Amino acid sequence: MDRSDTAVALGSDRDQRLREAVARARRSDFYRRHLDGFVLTGRADLHRLPLTFKHHLREATPFGMLAVPPHRAWHYHETSGTTGEPISTWCGLSELRSMAAVVHRLVPELSEDTILLNRFPLFAPVSFVFEEALRLAGACHIAAGTMSWDVPFDRAVDFIRRLGVTAIASLPLEPILLHDLAVDQGLDPRQTFASVRVVFCGGAVLPPALRRAIEHDWQARVVEIYGSNETMLMGVGCPRGRLHLCSDLLETEVLDPQTHQPVAAGAAGVMTVTSLVHEVMPLVRYYTGDLVRIAPEPCGCGHAGPVADVLGRIDDVIEIGAGRATHADVLDAAYTFADRLGTRIFFMLIRPRTLHLLVEVEHPESVADPIAERRLAEQIGLPVVVEYLGHNEVLDRSALYRGPKIYKPSVVSDWRGSARKTITIMEALLEWPKYDWRTVLHLARRQVRNARRRSRIVKEDKKV
């Protein structure tokens, strides 16, 4: 078979997989109505099918998107609801295993001697993708989601140090916080994190400057993980630091946000996906709202999957005056600027007429650099005001230690010994730290400073 015959065969196989995927989707109540009257023969006429938007999923929650009875699903999840009512998402064991196999195949660091500290929220499907990938590798999985009070940040640092953790998986900001916390504890991160070989980052944009910062601080490879609760896994980073879309799992389109037509090669558009392996909650032309750019050239790693840059949410694009910037643009420039100041800690405010960067430095009174600030604004393409603050003003490290201790629910408290003497169910369940007067004074002063800063900014914006 020559090259052209192979291409025809592969195309025919892809068309067949797509037809089967759409047929599975039609088993759900939503797609039975949504696709009524539409015929799909292959990829060439995929664009004729109607798009699926997030509001469709919300309106169909909880059972309308299911293509199988609920009891045949392996896991149930919900979105956080930060942008509206939570959306139900269901996944099956077979598709979870397909996604885990992709991660296991593309990441050589996931071997039988791996110990992975999973800091993704445990209600997120990606946590179970990692669990299954580690099962395939015969490796160890530590489920310690960052939103769980029983494994706060300081305990996560302790896990890495005591257990010889070789991999962590988290939102991109977490490695920055864990590294900073280790320094605050008087530890040497180069020794504390010496066992870590790979850091998986997902759930938010990962601009190049942030990747470089994590790789420098942890002396480990950073692997980007791209996906969502609705779509689950969509992309995995390669050894060259490029994100490859999972073309074995999904049929992808990149659409213009205004016209919903395909963008030109190399142009930014909204990622739109059709499930190829999902059996429980298949999606057809799901408009994710993620702004991406597909690289026109192949990656030198040899992996055939399309290479993508994830730029952030289309709804989060910042427009001030005639300027326009994505979250990836803003974060890349901010991390580059902060790195030159010897810090990783900053917070960006989006104000009506300007961006406002609050950056934490050792000597705030003597580091102002108008030339660097002007370059920062030029790199982003928007006006930027920089405010330099002292240690603990942007990140209060002590707050990372102040979470409650969690106990098993109980309605009995034995007061005869030295154990905790509780008198309510909530006291038995949660033990909040007791503050001395110095801590109380510290917290009060911080609240006053933040209130004054907030009031000043609000007044300035009202004058505009």
Predicted regions and their residues:
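Conserved AMP-binding/adenylate-forming
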Residues: 197, 206, 210-298
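Conserved beta-strand segments of alpha/beta enzyme cores
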Residues: 140, 221, 251, 383-385
